[in-house]
């Protein structure tokens, strides 16, 4: 991911990355409520301590990070939301993983497809056509549910973990254009 952060810097952005509790080298155990809190603390730090206006902040979430990004972005006056390979809900993800029997157990967890309806900011959804971890239909479901200004970028042949490197030109050009267009409207 460091390469991705460096690329975002080359596009002229400041980057504040979060490692959620229980992920990577972060301590603690992951939970839906916990990672949402981590996202909120990070956003509040960037806005209140670092002094960035929320209307100039883009929130970026990839895969499971899309759930934190979507939860955080709802009802906020931010510059934009970028979701890469977003899952639509834990229920849908359990079904994709062959855990259909578990769908009643996940309840309303990670419901991007519901929360995205409260997004006011511009939205960019990017997804690979060959994503076998979070199928593209989930990204489309999130996109279709959004009512804000939105665009969907499908990357032909891309899987779940190779969008930013193997398909770099399409990926980074799309992000660059979105950042410029959304910033212009602020």
Language-model segment annotations:
Residues 140-144, 148-186:
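C-terminal catalytic histidine-bearing segment of alpha/beta-hydrolase fold enzymes
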Residues 20-24, 88, 159-160:
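Alpha/beta-hydrolase active-site loop signature
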Residues 129-134, 160-162:
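Acidic catalytic loop of the alpha/beta-hydrolase fold
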Residues 79, 83-121:
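Mobile cap/lid helix-loop segments that gate and shape the active-site cleft of serine hydrolases
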Residues 1-45, 73:
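Membrane-embedded segments
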Residues 45-49, 54-97:
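Primarily recognizes the serine-hydrolase "nucleophile elbow" in alpha/beta-hydrolase
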Residues 4, 112, 121, 135-144:
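Short alpha-helix in the alpha/beta-hydrolase fold that links the catalytic acid
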